[in-house]
Amino acid sequence: MQKTIFYVYPQHHDVSFKFVAQEHVKMLREKYIVYEIPTLSFYQFTPFRYPISIIHPLFYSMWKWGKIEFSFFEQYRTRVSALLGVEVADTDKIAKQYIEYANNFTDGMILNSEWSVNAFKNSGLKVPAYKVFHNFKDRLLAKNEELKLDDQILYIEKLKKEKNFKLIFISLWHSDYRKGADIFHVIAKELQKERNDIYFLVKSGLPRTDFQDLKMFNIFGNTSFDNIVKMYRISDLYLLTSRGGSFELNGLEAFISKIPALATKGGAWEDYYPPNLKDLLIDSCENPQIFPDNPIHIGNGVQMCIGKAIDKILEVLDNYDNYKAKIEENYNFWIENFSYNAVKKQLLEVMEKYSN
């Protein structure tokens, strides 16, 4: 008989962990019966026949629960054969109260990077921690002629070919401080002083009027993933200035799109940097607190050294063919570790430990 899984996730809220959860559900359905349970009221369910339950993210609702909600949850816990939490670490430390929730209520934690595993363990996690990466979307592998593109993206591509300028891409959809928007702005202004052939492609939620001193194309608001795929492909380099975060998919997407990604040494993204591309990791000059008011992610992150970043960007642009060759050389590394099938294998291996 197939084992049943109750997969709990926030179906009402279009955020990154909803989409990761939906990918996990799709993967698990290849081997298990999976029921999708809404986060907002899951603790009031009475599971039948003792399924495995996965709660993604584990802490999503707990920060505002009171005694009544926890009493319901404790009953829920007695009705499942195993409970696994899925979480991330956006800083290098998790608050003690939430580590206690993980230790007291779960049989194990599924975490998305070595950084997240270390943050949880160093914060006192006692239950097993399993590393299951985020996967990149297969659409990144599509042929150019398969992409359905907006005129704005095609115009940027056409202009770049005509003017022969360099294009540096960054995504600043939300969380400006964590994403390092201020660091990007300083680096960009200095690069423009060094070379007159560098332009910037900024994807953002709202118009970036604060970047009007840059030679910039600003794609703001919702856009299709096909457009995003093309934005990577017409760019020469992706600049990942994030101070924190548990994985930062943009850097991986850049490598899959066969362009170099520059990031800061010591962050969660190091998992997808193979040895001969680690020189693209810039030294960190500080370890700032990322979320002063966050009750869960209470630790620090990294901060890119601006001068060293500028020097490295110029070096990469001057030796571009060399870096492109290294990316080609390592392409199987990303496919074997971060593709849909690779991550599905990681997830199913975890589930096998609890399904017998």
Swiss-Prot record:
Entry superkingdom: Viruses
Name of the protein: Uncharacterized protein 356
Species annotation: Sulfolobus islandicus rod-shaped virus 1
